[in-house]
UniProtKB/Swiss-Prot annotation:
SUPFAM superfamilies, alphabetized: Nucleotidylyl transferase
BP term (GO), one: pantothenate biosynthetic process
Gene that encodes it: panC
Active site, UniProt feature: 37
Predominant place of localization: cytoplasm
Name listed for the protein in its UniProt record: Pantothenate synthetase
Lineage: Bacteria, Pseudomonadati, Thermodesulfobacteriota, Desulfuromonadia, Geobacterales
EC number assigned by the record: 6.3.2.1
Residues the entry annotates as binding beta-alanine: 61
Assembly, per entry: Homodimer.
Molecular-function GO terms, alphabetical: ATP binding; pantoate-beta-alanine ligase activity
Amino acid sequence: MKLIESIEEMQSTAINARQAGKTVALVPTMGYLHAGHASLMDEGRKRADILVASIFVNPTQFGAGEDFNTYPRDLEKDKLIAKAAGVDYIFAPKASDMYPTGYQTYVNVEKLTRPLCGASRPGHFRGVTTVVAKLFNIVMPHLALFGKKDFQQLTVIRRMAADLNMTVQIVGMPIVRESDGLAMSSRNAYLSQAERQSALCLSLALQSVRGAFRSGERSVEALRKLALDIINAEAFAVIDYVEFYHEATLTEVEQADDRTLVALAVKIGKTRLIDNCVLGED
């Protein structure tokens, strides 16, 4: 496994791989890797000849007062996890190279970025789509793998790739959870022991909603109340949103069906966590 920091070296490596007839898979990350990231890498390893993991805490997707400066970083540990997952190259560019002096070009997906996290984190998705577009141009992957925990992000990136005629295949992978149900996230490291216990309200709320749906409940109003009651019972929890959307269009629905996305964003103490499920999926 090789660590590459230079954009030019990563591009030339990708060009050489493609010219040799090899397929390239990319797993974009912000580092502080966990088993969720490893599952993406494992899948990429199966599907491609060359596996690249990018590690870049992208400043343009953090807003004022967010956690860019405190976001957890541990490159040495990340290298061990990536190597164990069969990564060939870690691409870890410097922010000053990705956004040099005079940089002024951004990629913006319009409608899909307005609800959910886009409403509470203005500018976030513009930063995400810009950095992902840049990574696609640098790494030139045949496929790129993203986790479904960031469901809106996955939907937005798919839209960007389609709208801009990018040839990269976007692969969405299932959420990886801790043994007690908490969705794996680098931000879980912020949680105190008590907050960590409180954070289970997200997955418990989703389980309750899914159970009621499978028992025949279709009213979004009733299903939302189930989720709200569970989350509001936790002392540390402050709800950002509990929403029911069509999974493909991210438009609100009043009656739930198999393609309804249940999306949650909840602050546990100072830590903002997200989780989701699609009601028709296991």
